[in-house]
């Protein structure tokens, strides 16, 4: 069983509704959550609601067969997939094709779509929206509608009647407007669930509202109508290494932006993954390589700077030529400082948080130098989203950069991937589907030095 919850646009309530549905259905089913697009934050709510790690599905990173492979791997021993879309149903990397859109995932998985509409001040115009979304692409099965932010029950019933009589699409529920149930936001989007002490109580509240407002039995019936997937699959990672190595992964309230498949690709390449906290731990685990993902080090820079023992150990790990791969927030952590707070100091540059977006885009990178995760001449898709920047220009740049950024911005002069010994740090986030040798290459790099 599978179903996609898509919006007519951003800010229609997809995450609140999807998470509430996931929580409500988890009382009876083993629910596997998914999120369309390059999002680390919404999935934290899905995971908390279901107890199962939410996965990302993205047609910019993944070929069609890889979308199905990632989906089917995650669905083993699960009952139903609830897939939260991104932005509007048809929004992708440009205004014409489907790449990067929720619609592309619906096609790859042959999944029915429930369209979520912000119904504030709409009645018959909501029917026009549904007609337009149906007509734009007949391959998309818009099987139902959820009306969010209706004024009252009378408003809901009028809008439901209009949609069902004009479009022949059923409305399976409506949620009365209540701004108190919205999720707290910050500069990169929602505040991750791992940082909110009251996240679970909010999810319980959303679930109760969903149970009162949406016909969940009908939603499950629609999900059951999805046909069996018979189209071919394509592996999202390659297995290159069989020798056992250990990789330390930074994971806490500061660093938690990881795609689960990236971690699994390490495990598939004989890596034992050991998690550690740069914020709280007093020593590194006994490992052969480090992976430091993104997050919010700019909000914890002072606390990170006070853990001087761990800062020194990571610097020493680097000096011993053992591999370290860092993305975005991890890149900032390896710099000399964040704001004026001292960090690891692998690189002599300073990083700061600005008041405007520095980069928000899907990226295409070409590898120009061999490094611990990729080889010269390869190309890979990724994404970048940050308000921070590294204070580097042609007057102080001292490092080779591994990647030419063909689409996107990068860290410096349309380049990214600071290289120093066996350490690589980049603003570009990678997904193993776009770099199938990621786990194997990092494992081999760790094996050659310390494994």
From Swiss-Prot:
Active site: 328 (nucleophile)
Entry GO MF terms: ATP binding; cobyrinic acid a,c-diamide synthase activity
CDD domains reported in the protein's UniProt record: CobB_N (cd05388), GATase1_CobB (cd03130)
UniProt cofactor(s): Mg(2+)
Record-marked site positions (Increases nucleophilicity of active site Cys): 429
Keyword ATP-binding: yes
Domain (GATase cobBQ-type) ranges: 246-437
GO BP: any one term: methanogenesis
Keyword annotations of the record: ATP-binding, Cobalamin biosynthesis, Glutamine amidotransferase, Ligase, Magnesium, Methanogenesis, Nucleotide-binding
Pfam families (alphabetical): CbiA (PF01656), GATase_3 (PF07685)
Bridged cysteine pairs (disulfide): none
HAMAP family: CobB_CbiA
Entry domain remark: Comprises of two domains. The C-terminal domain contains the binding site for glutamine and catalyzes the hydrolysis of this substrate to glutamate and ammonia. The N-terminal domain is anticipated to bind ATP, and cobyrinate or Ni-sirohydrochlorin, and catalyzes the ultimate synthesis of the diamide product. The ammonia produced via the glutaminase domain is probably translocated to the adjacent domain via a molecular tunnel, where it reacts with an activated intermediate.
This protein's name: Cobyrinate a,c-diamide synthase
Gene symbol of the encoding locus: cbiA
């Amino acid at each position: 069983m599978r179903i996609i919850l898509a919006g007519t646009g951003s800010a229609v309530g997809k995450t609140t509704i999807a998470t509430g549905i996931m929580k409500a259905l988890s009382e009876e089913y083993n629910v596997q959550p998914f999120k369309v697009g390059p999002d680390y934050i919404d999935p934290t709510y899905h995971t908390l609601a279901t107890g199962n790690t939410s996965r990302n599905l993205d047609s910019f990173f993944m070929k069609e067969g890889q979308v199905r492979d990632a989906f089917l791997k995650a669905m083993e021993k699960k009952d139903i997939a609830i897939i939260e879309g991104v932005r509007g149903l048809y929004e992708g990397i440009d205004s014409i094709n489907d790449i990067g859109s929720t619609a592309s995932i619906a096609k790859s998985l042959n999944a029915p779509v429930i369209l979520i509409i912000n119904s504030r001040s709409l009645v018959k115009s909501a029917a026009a929206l549904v007609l337009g979304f149906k007509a734009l692409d007949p391959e998309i099965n818009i099987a139902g509608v959820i009306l969010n932010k209706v004024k009252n029950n009378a408003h809901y019933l009028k809008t439901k009647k209009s949609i069902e009589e004009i479009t022949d699409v059923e409305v399976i529920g409506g949620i009365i407007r209540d701004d108190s149930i919205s999720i707290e936001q910050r500069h990169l989007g929602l505040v991750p669930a791992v940082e909110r002490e009251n996240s679970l109580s909010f999810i319980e509240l959303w679930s109760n509202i969903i149970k009162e407002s949406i016909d969940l039995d009908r939603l499950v019936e629609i999900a059951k109508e999805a046909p069996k997937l018979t189209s071919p699959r394509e592996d999202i990672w390659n297995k290159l290494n069989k020798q056992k190595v250990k990789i330390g992964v930074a994971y806490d309230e500061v660093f938690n932006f990881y795609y689960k498949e990236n971690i699994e690709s390490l495990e598939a390449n004989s890596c034992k993954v050991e998690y550690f906290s740069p914020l709280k731990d007093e020593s590194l685990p006994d490992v052969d390589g480090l992976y430091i993902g993104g997050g919010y080090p700019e909000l914890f820079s002072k606390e990170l700077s006070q853990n001087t023992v761990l800062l020194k150990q990571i610097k020493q790990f680097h000096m011993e030529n053992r591999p370290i791969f860092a993305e975005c927030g991890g890149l900032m952590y390896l710099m000399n400082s964040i704001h004026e707070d001292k960090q690891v100091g692998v690189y002599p540059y300073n990083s700061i948080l600005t008041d405007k977006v520095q980069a928000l885009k899907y990226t295409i990178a070409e590898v120009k130098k061999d490094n611990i995760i990729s080889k010269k001449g390869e190309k890979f898709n990724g994404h970048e989203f940050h308000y921070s920047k590294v204070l580097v220009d042609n007057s102080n740049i001292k490092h080779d950069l591994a990647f030419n950024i063909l689409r996107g911005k990068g860290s410096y002069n349309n380049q990214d991937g600071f290289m120093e010994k066996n350490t690589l740090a980049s603003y570009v986030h990678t997904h193993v589907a776009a770099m199938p040798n990621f786990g194997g290459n990092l494992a081999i790099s760790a094996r050659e030095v310390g494994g």
